[in-house]
Structures are given as C-alpha cells and as structure tokens.
Amino acid sequence: MSSLKKILGLKGKGKKSKKLGIAPPPYEEDTSMEYAPSAPIDKSYFGVDEMDTHDPNQLRYEKFFFTVKMTVRSNRPFRTYSDVAAAVSHWDHMYIGMAGKRPFYKILAFLGSSNLKATPAVLADRGQPEYHAHCEGRAYLPHRMGKTPPMLNVPEHFRRPFNIGLYKGTVELTMTIYDDESLEAAPMIWDHFNSSKFSDFREKALMFGLIVEKKASGAWVLDSVSHFK
C-alpha cells in the first residue's frame, strides 16, 4: 500500500523541483502529520463512515450473472485435467483488470477449465490441439472475502502464454460478471462445474489461487485468495 505521503503528493523537505531547479512551492514541503492512520479507523473521518470492516468469520453471499468463453491452444494434447489446470491457472499472470472482480474471475477460469472440450483436429488452427468452453448463467457464491465492490456488466479479455513441462501454448479468456439484484433463486457457482473431471476439488481450486472450505452442510465456501498464485 502506498504511504499517505505518496497518496497526498507530499515530498521530502528541501528537495528541488526537477523541472525548474528551484525550491519547491509550499504544497511540496513536508509537514508534520497530526494523524497517522492505524487500525481501527475512526468512523468520524471523511469517507470511512460506511467502510466495511472485514470479518474473516462473516459469511456473505454474492449473486451474479456470468459468462466465460475460453480457448486453449497447446503444442500437444493434454493427458489429464491436472495438466489442463496447470496451464489455464496462469491466465492471470501479470494481471491487469478490475481488481474487485479478480477473485470471481479466478472462479470463472476454474469453471471454464472444467468444461473444456477438444476441438476436432481437422478444425483446429494449424492442426494443433485446441480446447473450447462456453459457460453462462446465474449463480451465487458463499464467501468470506468481505464486502465486494459493485460489479458492472463490462466484459474483459485476457490472453496469456503458458510453458508448463511438456506443454506450451496460449490461454484466451473473455469473462463477464455483474450483480444480479433480482429476487429469483440461483444455484451455487460450484453447481456449474463439471466435477467428473477431477476428484480433489480443494486441491484443484488451490491451483487457481482459491482457498475453499466445506461447510457442515457440505457446501463449498470461498475463504480467501492465495497471494502466491
């Protein structure tokens, strides 16, 4: 997180302007801060009166519409779903996109990978193995990620190369996710997965940077997102 000085544009005292070579104007001079941010934040300060405090034990439910289109091209056919997951999970390497949607995009990438189907060789580009998936619908996600920002109907496209062991190729993803404010019931996002492709759901989710736990009811909950994936 940037320091408050950087956010406010404050610089060290006595530094000269790089453009003019003269002493900086008053607004560039260092000042003593009467308030040093620390937790908990005083709700009386501007802009924090409705700030959500993340309680890791609080279970929330997010309902949304989603679409995911995925194309994976590889130099050779994948043998197992683990090979597929290892390749596709690199889709958000050097991620540039909407930060608030990233955990949900990770889920959609995981979802898309479980529904990939091989394209007939005669139709594949240059005869190389290709896999495609297209999933859309409504769903809800039980999670402990804290309050999420509003999600608008804006598609985002990602294209990333992968080089995993014997496999080299590209992953292309187009994903859309936005808030569902209707009162209609929706299935859990996990119900859209093709679970026949893998046995250890928790392990495969972690490959995509998703840390999930199972409730007493047997339903999966997104606890957090791994910072190492």
Curated annotation (Swiss-Prot):
The keyword Cytoplasm does not apply. Keywords: Apoptosis, Eukaryotic host gene expression shutoff by virus, Host cytoplasm, Host gene expression shutoff by virus, Host membrane, Host mRNA suppression by virus, Host nucleus, Host-virus interaction, Inhibition of host mRNA nuclear export by virus, Membrane, Phosphoprotein, Viral budding, Viral budding via the host ESCRT complexes, Viral matrix protein, Viral release from host cell, Virion. It holds the Pfam family Vesiculo_matrix. Phosphorylated by host. Residues 1-23 are annotated as: Disordered. It is a peripheral membrane protein. A motif (PTAP/PSAP motif) lies at residues 37-40. VSV is used as an oncolytic agent for cancer therapy, because of his wide host range, rapid replication and mild pathogenicity in humans. VSV used are mutated at M51R in their matrix protein. These mutated viruses cannot successfully infect normal cells, being unable to counteract the antiviral state induced by interferon-alpha in normal cells. Cancer cells are impeded with responsiveness to interferon, and then can be successfully infected and lysed by the virus. GO terms for molecular function: structural constituent of virion. Coiled coil: none annotated. A motif (dynamin binding) lies at residues 2-4. A motif (PPXY motif) lies at residues 24-27. It is found in: Virion; Host endomembrane system; Host nucleus membrane; Host nucleus. Homomultimer. Interacts with viral nucleocapsid; this interaction contributes to the virion assembly. Interacts with the viral envelope glycoprotein; this interaction contributes to the virion assembly. Interacts with host RAE1-NUP98 complex. Interacts with host NEDD4 and TSG101. Interacts with host dynamin. Interacts with host NDUFAF4; the interaction inhibits viral propagation and is independent of interferon activation. Interacts with host GTF2H5; the interaction may inhibit host transcription. Forms a double layer around the helical nucleocapsid, the inner matrix layer binding to the N helix and the outer matrix layer binding to the envelope glycoprotein. Plays a major role in assembly and budding of virion, by recruiting cellular partners of the ESCRT complexes that play a key role in releasing the budding particle from the host membrane. Condensates the ribonucleocapsid core during virus assembly. Belongs to the vesiculoviruses matrix protein family. Late-budding domains (L domains) are short sequence motifs essential for viral particle budding. They recruit proteins of the host ESCRT machinery (Endosomal Sorting Complex Required for Transport) or ESCRT-associated proteins. M contains two overlapping L domains: a PPXY motif which interacts with the WW domain 3 of NEDD4 and a PTAP/PSAP motif, which interacts with the UEV domain of TSG101. This is Matrix protein. The gene is M.
